[in-house]
Amino acid sequence: MKKIVIAIDGHSSSGKSTMAKDLAKEIGYTYIDTGAMYRAVTLYCIQHGFFEGEKIKEEELKASIHDIDISFRLNAETGRPDTYLNGVNVEKEIRGMEVADKVSPVATLGFVRRALVAKQQEMGKAKGIVMDGRDIGTVVFPDAELKLFVTASPEVRAKRRVDELEAKGIPASYEEVLENVKKRDYIDSTREESPLRQADDALVLDNSHMTLEEQKAWLLEQYHKAIGS
């Protein structure tokens, strides 16, 4: 059976990561969470004092960008990959609100995106991957055999994010998360470097009122169509 690249783009907290993880597990592909990579760089910046309020010290980050090693290792308990920053498991830290509030300024930096896109393209050379993010189908893998664009209303996405954080033992305010979701939508859609946009040949899924099982069935149907089975 031929292996392909599956690119899943969409808004923050649209459920695309859960969908991508479940699909990868179901079909035996490798899952790569590009959002986690940008969050890991953001955590590195926080740890090294590269923020002055909302502003990032660009020159200091640029000088350190090649010292940042991001990898994914399978968590035997969850059956899903955890994110490692320079050899340390940071899966819980990168999901907190402090990182969520600061990730957009980091992700808008051209040199950060170029460094991570190069790493993502290297990861996908052998195919057999499911990669989710904001610019996978438009920038990272414009020739991906299957492109999907996932969306949902800001209110639905904020509720999902709160539920996800609380399930991990991270306290969260719905109003604060909703404000963060809307702010990230604006920044992601208007930034100069690789803005969030739907690829012309992407299949669109609005999952505002779909169950996880309905989403999974739809995804598998698109996958089998793409590989011709």
From Swiss-Prot:
Its Gene Ontology biological processes?
nucleobase-containing small molecule interconversion; pyrimidine nucleotide metabolic process
**Keyword vocabulary terms for this entry:** ATP-binding, Cytoplasm, Kinase, Nucleotide-binding, Transferase
Q: Name one Pfam family in it.
A: Cytidylate_kin
One cellular component (GO) term of this entry: cytosol
* Protein localization: Cytoplasm
Q: Which InterPro entries match?
A: Cytidylate_kin, Cytidylate_kinase_dom, P-loop_NTPase
For the ligand (ATP), the binding residues are: G10, H11, S12, S13, S14, G15, K16, S17, T18
Report if keyword Metal-binding is assigned.
no
From the Swiss-Prot or TrEMBL record, what is one GO molecular function term? CMP kinase activity
What's the chief localization of this chain? Answer: cytoplasm
- What EC number(s) does its UniProt record assign? 2.7.4.25
Would you say which domain of life the source belongs to?
Bacteria
Q: Which family does it belong to?
A: Belongs to the cytidylate kinase family. Type 1 subfamily.
Q: What is this protein called?
A: Cytidylate kinase
Please give the organism. Answer: Parabacteroides distasonis (strain ATCC 8503 / DSM 20701 / CIP 104284 / JCM 5825 / NCTC 11152)
The gene behind this protein is cmk
